[in-house]
């Protein structure tokens, strides 16, 4: 009875175990996740790419920048769009921005290209005999120092005929010539040479070209985007929480200047101070003002310009007559505006550098090249070098509430004396200089000071002041002051994520149906969750393609406009690069989609299972709480692995599809009678006949071998054999007696078809008998295995129950034995303790008894 109960329990356990296992399998299958490809996701990565320019310049303007921008830049967008990216935090670094390097190279290339067709002034490297100039003016009170600012020089120069020379007179600024061997004994006459002749070649700027810059917009090619930081308190480096995306930057004027930044953008709220490292006094400090300061510069004289032939087909432009005082070039700055601005700058510097007990001092430049020690800039085609000591000569006093300044200026206008140079060594490059031809007439230019470039003196141990001086010289800092809030990123429209959808069947691809989604822009959904952003994928993907096409058309028109020049500028080359890069990126993405079997699809499920080692986050965490940017960072290390698995899966699917299509041609009954299949039928027929003949031979050989083993001689199976029974012997062997008297013969078959039919019949019977025997044997083996297995399982179950009971009894016996032993040991311990206690308690009694005995 006990065994039957155990068997019944075991059967119940088997049923419940099978049910639980099935439920586990179903649940696990229901939770399987598969890789799904998304095209058009708002994901980007930092990148460096070739930017192109846009400008609204007019083609009829003769100014070089304008001509260059008109022919080499695309027109600006009259309605530029800026798309805010909510819930996005991006890192910016103005000190490691490739846009700055590109702009620096572009402006240098612009200046170099403007000089290429111009006249080389190498013949001017001759000995100059110079003396002070005589000024033709009604005012006879002319300062001697001002007279020495310009020299009237004579020199011999080749005329239109190379074998003839003539003496030529022209005027040079004192800064452009250097004496040879000291002054002569004549006092006001000596030998000079041009300042560049021992270091660099000189090229005269083309006379119809001025250097007044116009705004230039830098634009990203298709497949890339420009991110803009709109955080007012952004200091140029670090995370920015107010980010937007634009296709082009704002209009940036390529103003080449030192110490002061002119006609740039202004800060919002308050003055902004930016530096790569505030504690390093070797790093430049870029100050962005919140309110512009007007600066008016002028050369008050009325100059004339003359052309001097220096050889066949070459002309040198020099200053002719001088009307008025040409040396009195100067700039005017409002003292009130400047003091107010500098006080705000000092307040911001104090926050970054010093404590509340330190004064801030502004001082003039400590020395260096004239481009560094003065405020150098271009005004109306002339290069001014102005002394800024009047601007940087004050102290921010500690504890003074009215921001008292000590300025060495009495009037309300600060006058900055300026000098003019015509030989300019641009970009601090050795070996190349430019001669700026003089500009006739009065020159006046009005600009806005929008920024300052400062350097900080090293702080000594015994000083409580911080001294700041004007700096500059590296034009990258000028461009950095405008490009600090931009960065270029590469759009990565392909994304993979786990979903429950699986590519289940092998079928021909169909183009995905577009979803009617509201237009948010390609990167507009960057801050949305993955689930919300996936709704706009169709619109984003179409916008990407349309943006590429539109941009290619604009670039193509700009390139076509340069064909009459028979050459391309640096911008033309970059536009070609931008066109190729945009098409290449789009084709690369489409190639990947085609390899994965996702051509024309925005959401493409695959049959690649999602590996939890890539990311073990749940579906709700992924699609409801994460953005595509966060998800891309989560799986960026496994992206290439996933791509390879998708490609392998698609390759296998194509193989399966090819096999399926190969079988599809037999689906129609009429295809069986197609003439193209006849050769295939003949081949199969020949194979069957050959197989039958081979089997016939094999069975014949086996039959002969079998008969030989039984003692018979091999006879032809096509010969009729007649056996005459002996009168006293029955048919066959003794055990076969009693059979009827008849002849025994082998069946004689004649003809091809009867022979084939007989062989086929024998083959079928043989196969049937052998297969039946094999099936019976297999069924018997399976039945035996099942019975033995069930008996073994029952035996093992009973054995487990038996040994469980035995172990239980053994454990109980062990516990009883331990309890008894512990009880005995405990009783002895208690008895010993009791005896010790009684002995201790009887000590007084024993003492009393001892005393009583002693007294007795």
UniProtKB/Swiss-Prot annotation:
Chain intervals for the UniProt region annotation (V5): 461-471, 463-471
For this chain the motif Di-leucine internalization motif maps to 855-856
Q: Where is this motif: YXXL motif?
A: 712-715
Q: Give the lipid-moiety residues, type S-palmitoyl cysteine.
A: 764
Q: Spell out the coiled coil positions from the record.
A: 633-667
Q: Which domain of life is it from?
A: Viruses
Instruction: Output this protein's name.
Output: Envelope glycoprotein gp160
Species this chain originates from: Human immunodeficiency virus type 1 group M subtype A (isolate Z321) (HIV-1)
At the highest ranks, the source species' classification is: Viruses, Riboviria, Pararnavirae, Artverviricota, Revtraviricetes
């Amino acid at each position: 009875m006990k065994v039957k109960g155990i068997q019944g329990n075991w059967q119940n356990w088997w049923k419940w175990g099978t049910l639980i296992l099935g439920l586990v399998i179903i649940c696990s299958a229901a939770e399987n996740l598969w890789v799904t490809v998304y095209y058009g996701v708002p994901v980007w990565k930092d990148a460096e790419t070739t930017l192109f320019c846009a400008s609204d310049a007019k083609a009829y303007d003769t100014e070089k920048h304008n001509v260059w921008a008109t022919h080499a830049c695309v027109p600006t967008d009259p309605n530029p769009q800026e798309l805010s990216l909510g819930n996005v935090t991006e890192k910016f670094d103005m000190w490691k921005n490739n846009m700055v390097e590109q702009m620096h190279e572009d402006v240098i290339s612009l200046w170099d290209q403007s000089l290429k067709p111009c006249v080389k002034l190498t013949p001017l490297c001759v000995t100059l005999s110079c003396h002070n100039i005589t000024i033709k003016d009604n005012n006879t009170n002319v300062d001697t120092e001002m007279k020495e600012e310009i020299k009237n020089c004579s020199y011999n120069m080749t005329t239109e005929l190379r074998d003839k020379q003539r003496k030529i007179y022209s005027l040079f600024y004192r800064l452009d010539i250097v004496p040879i061997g000291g002054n002569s004994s004549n006092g006001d006459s000596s030998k000079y040479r041009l300042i560049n002749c021992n270091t660099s070649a000189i090229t005269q700027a083309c006379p119809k070209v001025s250097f007044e810059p116009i705004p230039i917009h830098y634009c990203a090619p298709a497949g890339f985007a420009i991110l803009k930081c709109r955080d007012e308190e952004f200091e140029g480096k670090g995370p920015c929480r107010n980010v937007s995306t634009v296709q082009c930057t704002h209009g940036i004027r390529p103003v080449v200047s030192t110490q002061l930044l002119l006609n740039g953008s202004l800060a919002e709220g308050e003055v902004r101070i930016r530096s790569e490292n505030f504690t390093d006094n070797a790093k430049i400090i870029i100050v962005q003002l919140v309110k512009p300061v007007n600066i008016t510069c002028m050369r008050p004289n009325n100059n004339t310009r003359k052309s001097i032939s220096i050889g066949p087909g070459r002309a040198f432009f020099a200053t002719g007559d001088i009307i008025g005082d040409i040396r009195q070039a100067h700039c005017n700055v409002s003292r009130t505006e400047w003091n107010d601005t500098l006080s705000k700058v000092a307040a911001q510097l104090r926050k970054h550098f010093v404590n509340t007990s330190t004064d801030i001092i502004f001082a003039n430049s400590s020395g260096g090249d004239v481009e560094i020690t003065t405020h150098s800039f271009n005004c109306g085609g002339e290069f001014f070098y102005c002394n800024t000591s009047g601007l940087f000569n004050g102290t921010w006093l500690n504890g003074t509430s009215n921001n008292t300044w000590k300025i060495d200026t009495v009037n309300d206008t600060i006058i900055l004396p300026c000098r003019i140079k015509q030989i300019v060594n641009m970009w601090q490059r050795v070996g190349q200089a430019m001669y700026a031809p003089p500009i006739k007439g009065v020159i006046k230019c009005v600009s806005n000071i929008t920024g300052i470039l400062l350097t900080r003196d090293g702080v000594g141990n015994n000083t409580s002041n911080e001294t700041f001086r004007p700096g500059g010289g590296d034009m990258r800092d000028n461009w950095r002051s405008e490009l600090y809030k931009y960065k270029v990123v590469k759009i990565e429209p392909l994304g993979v994520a786990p979903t429950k959808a699986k590519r289940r069947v092998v079928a021909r691809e169909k183009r995905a149906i577009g979803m009617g989604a509201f237009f948010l822009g390609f990167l507009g959904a960057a801050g949305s969750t993955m689930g919300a952003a996936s709704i706009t994928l169709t619109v984003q993907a179409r916008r990407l393609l349309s943006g590429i096409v539109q941009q290619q058309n604009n670039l193509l028109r700009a390139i076509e406009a340069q064909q009459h020049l028979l050459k391309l500028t640096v911008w033309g080359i970059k536009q070609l690069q931008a066109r190729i890069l945009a098409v290449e990126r789009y084709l690369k993405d489409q190639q990947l989609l085609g390899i994965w079997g996702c051509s024309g699809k925005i959401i493409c499920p695959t049959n690649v299972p999602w590996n939890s080692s890539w990311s073990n986050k749940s579906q709700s965490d992924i699609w409801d709480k994460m953005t595509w940017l966060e998800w891309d960072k989560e799986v960026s290390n496994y992206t290439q692995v996933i791509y390879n698995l998708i490609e392998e899966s698609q390759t296998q699917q194509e193989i399966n599809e090819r096999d399926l299509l190969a079988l599809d041609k037999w689906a129609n009954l009429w295809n069986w009678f197609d003439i193209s299949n006849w050769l295939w039928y003949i081949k199969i027929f020949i194979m069957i006949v050959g197989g039958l003949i081979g089997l016939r031979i094999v069975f014949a050989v086996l039959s002969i071998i079998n008969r030989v083993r039984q003692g018979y001689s091999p006879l032809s199976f096509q010969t009729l054999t007649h056996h005459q029974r002996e009168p006293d012997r029955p048919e066959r062997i003794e055990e076969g007696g009693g059979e009827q008297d008849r002849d025994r013969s082998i069946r004689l078959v004649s003809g091809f078809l009867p022979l084939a039919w007989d062989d086929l019949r024998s083959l079928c019977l043989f196969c049937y008998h052998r297969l039946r025997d094999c099936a019976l044997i297999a069924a018997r083996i399976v039945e035996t295995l099942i019975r033995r297995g069930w008996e073994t399982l029952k035996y093992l179950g009973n054995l487990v129950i038996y040994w469980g009971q035995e172990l239980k009894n053994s454990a109980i016996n062990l516990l009883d034995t331990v309890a008894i032993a512990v009880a005995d040991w405990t009783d002895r311990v208690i008895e010993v303790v009791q005896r010790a206690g009684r002995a201790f308690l009887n000590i007084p009694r024993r003492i009393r008894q001892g005393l009583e005995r002693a007294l007795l």
